């Protein structure tokens, strides 16, 4: 027999400003209601949230649940609803919007670029980027007498400059990085579409993309000349092998997607990770293994995305006795499964030495985040640079006063992180 999921009145897509001492109660409410709960979707109509860890892993691996945005309710549009809607000729090059063999082909193209050994070879360069950014912030703080602000000044710039470096895109300083991200977001490239739903600014302003296009094409043309071993070169070689040929536009689309994926959620997480380190929760004599465990616990405790991106039922599906119609929008509650007391003792506490490493922060199944190794490397490298170069670094406000918020179901982030680096 099949029936309906329990309906939960709380809104999973709104979150008041929070402090570090408080977590949203919605996840506990979902878990108590059942493994599958029904909620109101942002654009209206029903949506379903998976709250149970084992069921979540089943759903994320089930080919009946797909990322195809064509199955989304027709009333949904753009970034307000967390959709990625690439133009048809570019969809085969979009990891987060294709399934099945198309997705497996893209994974084969991208996987060599994220080979752990290849990434480890760039550790010194990644450390140099972190060192430069932190030193510039420390010098500015010394001159002004004000604490450095590490969210806007470091947490987002660091992974952005790293991914651009790895791709061979010559974005070399924070000002260039901010401009590039502003243009990409306005166009809706490489990530969820803009709020206007058509790739333009909702107000009708079309940004000047010529400077950014020049930088992206510079990376693509260098990759075609075989005079570089960047990620873009690897993508080009693999795409040629899979598709026979690949255009400049297609390569540009792939690398813009990696620029977004390589900095936005990572920047959110690094803010939380920095807060935990600067609050003194990492032992002064922590070795590499202890730092890795610390990062793992931060990933469990502070997932930068509280829910997965949308999936849709490709056909009618019954899970745990609940019937989902074709096209049913489905989310997995990442934060809720990460803090399930059935898998973790004191699940809402931050314990770096806890034995269980069970978490869904990077997803599961075929769409498991391909950039996990890079995010982990950036996290460990950042901690190493901070502790070796700025051993006196400390929070400028009490940990308990740090505030964070969410943007719908998509990202959780600290509003600011004032720090005395020296």
Swiss-Prot record:
The keyword Signal does not apply. GO terms for molecular function: heme binding; iron ion binding; oxidoreductase activity, acting on paired donors, with incorporation or reduction of molecular oxygen, NAD(P)H as one donor, and incorporation of one atom of oxygen. The gene is doxA. Pfam families: p450 (PF00067). It comes from Streptomyces sp. (strain C5). Monomer. It is an enzyme of class 1 (oxidoreductase). GO terms for biological process: daunorubicin biosynthetic process. Streptomyces sp. C5 produces significant quantities of doxorubicin only when doxA is strongly overexpressed, but under normal conditions, 14-hydroxylation of daunorubicin cannot favorably compete with baumycin biosynthesis from daunorubicin. S.peucetius subsp. caesius ATCC 27952, a mutant strain derived from S.peucetius ATCC 29050, is the only organism reported to produce doxorubicin in vivo. It is found in: Cytoplasm. InterPro entries: Cyt_P450, Cyt_P450_B, Cyt_P450_CS, Cyt_P450_sf. Its EC number is 1.14.13.181. Its cofactor is heme. This is Cytochrome P-450 monooxygenase DoxA. Pathway: Antibiotic biosynthesis; daunorubicin biosynthesis; Antibiotic biosynthesis; carminomycin biosynthesis. Keywords: Antibiotic biosynthesis, Cytoplasm, Heme, Iron, Metal-binding, Monooxygenase, NADP, Oxidoreductase. PROSITE patterns: CYTOCHROME_P450. Belongs to the cytochrome P450 family. Strongly inhibited by dithiothreitol and high ionic strength buffers. SUPFAM superfamilies: Cytochrome P450. Heme binds at residue 369. Optimum pH is 7.5. This optimal pH, slightly higher than normal physiological conditions, may be necessary to ensure that the proper ionic nature of the zwitterionic anthracycline substrates is maintained for optimal recognition. Involved in the biosynthesis of the anthracyclines carminomycin and daunorubicin (daunomycin) which are aromatic polyketide antibiotics that exhibit high cytotoxicity and are widely applied in the chemotherapy of a variety of cancers. Optimum temperature is 30 degrees Celsius. One of its GO terms (cellular component) is cytoplasm. It catalyses: 13-deoxydaunorubicin + NADPH + O2 + H(+) = 13-dihydrodaunorubicin + NADP(+) + H2O; 13-dihydrodaunorubicin + NADPH + O2 + H(+) = daunorubicin + NADP(+) + 2 H2O; 13-deoxycarminomycin + NADPH + O2 + H(+) = 13-dihydrocarminomycin + NADP(+) + H2O; 13-dihydrocarminomycin + NADPH + O2 + H(+) = carminomycin + NADP(+) + 2 H2O.
């Amino acid at each position: 027999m099949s029936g309906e999921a329990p309906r939960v009145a709380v809104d999973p897509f709104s979150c008041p400003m929070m402090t570090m001492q408080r977590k949203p109660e919605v996840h506990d409410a979902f878990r108590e209601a059942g493994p599958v709960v029904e909620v109101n979707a942002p654009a209206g109509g029903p949506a379903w949230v998976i709250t149970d860890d084992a069921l979540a892993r089943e759903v994320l691996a089930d080919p009946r649940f797909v990322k195809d945005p064509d199955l989304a309710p027709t009333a949904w549009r753009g970034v307000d609803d967390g959709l990625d809607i690439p133009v048809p000729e570019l969809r085969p090059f979009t990891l987060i919007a294709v399934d099945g063999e198309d997705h497996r082909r893209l994974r084969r193209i991208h996987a060599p670029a994220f080979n752990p050994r290849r990434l480890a070879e760039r550790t010194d360069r990644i450390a140099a980027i972190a060192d430069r950014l932190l030193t510039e912030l420390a010098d500015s703080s010394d001159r002004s007498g004000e604490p450095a602000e590490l969210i806007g000044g470091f947490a987002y710039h660091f992974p952005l400059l790293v991914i651009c470096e790895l791709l061979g895109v010559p974005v070399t300083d924070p000002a260039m990085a901010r401009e590039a991200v502003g243009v990409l977001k306005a166009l809706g490239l490489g990530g969820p579409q803009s709020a206007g739903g058509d790739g333009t600014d909702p107000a009708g302003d079309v940004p000047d993309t010529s400077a950014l296009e020049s930088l992206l094409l510079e990376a693509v043309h260098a990759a075609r000349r075989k005079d570089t071993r960047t990620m873009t070169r690897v993508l080009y070689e693999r795409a040629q092998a899979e598709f026979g040929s690949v255009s400049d536009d297609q390569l540009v689309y792939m690398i813009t997607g990696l620029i977004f994926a390589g900095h936005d959620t990572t920047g959110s997480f690094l803010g939380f990770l920095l807060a935990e380190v600067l609050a003194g929760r990492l032992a002064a004599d922590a070795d590499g293994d202890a730092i890795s465990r610390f990062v793992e616990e931060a990933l469990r405790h502070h997932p930068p995305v509280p829910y997965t991106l949308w999936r849709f039922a490709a056909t009618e599906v019954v899970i745990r006795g609940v019937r989902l119609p074709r096209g049913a929008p489905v989310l997995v509650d990442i934060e809720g499964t990460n803090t399930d007391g059935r898998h973790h003792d004191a699940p809402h506490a931050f314990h770096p030495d806890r034995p269980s490493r069970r978490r869904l922060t990077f997803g599961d199944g075929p769409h498991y985040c391909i950039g996990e190794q890079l995010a982990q490397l950036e996290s460990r490298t950042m901690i190493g640079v901070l502790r070796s170069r700025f051993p006196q670094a400390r929070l400028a406000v009490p940990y308990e006063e740090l505030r964070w918020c969410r943007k719908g179901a998509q990202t959780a982030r600290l509003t600011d992180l004032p720090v005395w680096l020296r």
